[in-house]
């Protein structure tokens, strides 16, 4: 009896070890598939929606200059598209696409892969529908976004500044021409070759002025914006996908079932739109903080004044007060239309492409 018991235990241990090894093997296989899916989806969405991101950044930062009235540089989204196309050329709409792609590859890989594995890990603790649909996406989405945003923050800083630099250069040109032309308008002056954006110079200036930590300028507001966005998005996506599948296609749909491309597309676009609308005010503040990285410290300032200057420009409260006092509540909604127009298709393209590649490749392996 004892011998049989020992043999049974050994057999069970061997089976468990075999299952564990198989699971580890599947995890390594799936990591590669998830990485391919997330990278491909991220690249596709970046190339398609970058023009909308450029317009959003311009609208959010056009009032950051001083000394002359910049309120009518761009009157709205369509006006921004027209003026940028007319005065700067169509390629300007893809300004920042290189740092955007550099950011997309590690960000999408870390974000989606982390989300998938955190989700599978959290599923072990409960198997109720409410837990799987609401709690798991909220927690997994939050943790995955914190990790990916922290890693890619320097690339986000570069992308934001490369898209907004033209506006501030145009402002400098306008000031120089103001004495000879009373009709000079910001956004209508062509840039000189010397004013092309230099990413290395930006990083060097930031490090020289505020140290290496300056490359993570805006990370706080980015997390404040992206963490709730991620939680809202994933919870909304999972809930909507679940409801659409059960009502339209499969009443017995579960988390392990496949969902078709168009269901993922609709759920991604809808949840992305909701999350974008709710987090736009934070996005405006984050953009202002990151654009302030271009401001250099005056050598005439004392060390304490320099420290105060840096703290002020890194403060979300300071920029919030500035926006409210100079632009009112509407200032917090600047760039809402292009942001939603960018985020909605980006979320739809990203998640539907990701799910399609993930499901097809993992299914092939199985």
Curated annotation (Swiss-Prot):
Its main location: mitochondrion. One of its GO terms (cellular component) is mitochondrial inner membrane. This is Mitochondrial substrate carrier family protein H. Keywords: Membrane, Mitochondrion, Mitochondrion inner membrane, Repeat, Transmembrane, Transmembrane helix, Transport. It comes from Dictyostelium discoideum. PANTHER family: FI19922P1-RELATED (PTHR45760:SF2). Solcar repeats lie at residues 29-121, 132-243, 259-360. It comes from the Eukaryota. It is a multi-pass membrane protein. Mitochondrial transporter required for glutathione import into mitochondria. Residues 1-25 have a biased composition (Low complexity).
């Amino acid at each position: 009896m004892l011998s049989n018991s020992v043999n049974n235990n050994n057999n069970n241990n061997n089976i468990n070890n075999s299952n564990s090894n198989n699971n580890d093997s599947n995890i390594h296989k799936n990591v590669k598939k998830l990485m391919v899916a997330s990278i491909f989806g991220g690249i596709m969405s970046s190339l398609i929606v970058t023009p909308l991101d450029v317009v959003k950044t311009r609208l959010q930062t056009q009032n950051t200059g001083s000394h002359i009235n910049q309120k009518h540089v761009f009157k709205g989204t369509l006006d921004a598209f027209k003026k940028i196309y007319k005065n700067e050329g169509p390629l300007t709409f893809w300004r920042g696409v290189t740092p955007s792609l550099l950011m997309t590859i590690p960000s999408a890989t870390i974000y989606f892969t982390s989300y998938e594995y955190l989700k599978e890990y959290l599923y072990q603790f409960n198997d109720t529908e409410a837990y799987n649909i609401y709690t798991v996406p909220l927690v997994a989405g939050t943790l995955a976004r914190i990790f990916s945003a922290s890693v890619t923050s320097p690339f986000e800083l570069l992308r934001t500044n490369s898209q907004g630099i033209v506006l501030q250069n145009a402002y400098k040109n306008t000031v120089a021409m103001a004495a000879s032309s009373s009709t000079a308008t910001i956004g209508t002056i062509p840039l000189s070759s010397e004013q092309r954006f230099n990413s290395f110079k930006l990083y060097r200036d930031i490090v020289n002025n505020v140290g290496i930590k300056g490359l993570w300028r805006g990370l706080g507001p980015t997390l404040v914006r992206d963490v709730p966005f991620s939680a809202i998005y994933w919870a909304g996506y999972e809930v909507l996908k679940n409801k659409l599948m059960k009502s339209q296609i499969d009443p017995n749909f579960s988390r392990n079932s496949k969902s078709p491309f168009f269901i993922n597309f609709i759920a991604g676009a809808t949840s992305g739109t909701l999350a974008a609308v709710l987090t736009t005010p934070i996005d405006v503040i984050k953009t202002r903080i990151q654009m302030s990285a271009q401001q250099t410290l005056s050598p005439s300032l004392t060390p304490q004044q320099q420290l105060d200057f840096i703290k002020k420009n890194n403060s979300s409260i300071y920029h919030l007060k500035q926006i409210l006092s100079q632009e009112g509540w509407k200032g917090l909604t600047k760039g809402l239309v292009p942001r939603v127009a960018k985020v909605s298709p980006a979320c739809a393209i990203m998640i539907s492409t990701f799910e399609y590649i993930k499901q097809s490749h993992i299914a092939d392996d199985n």
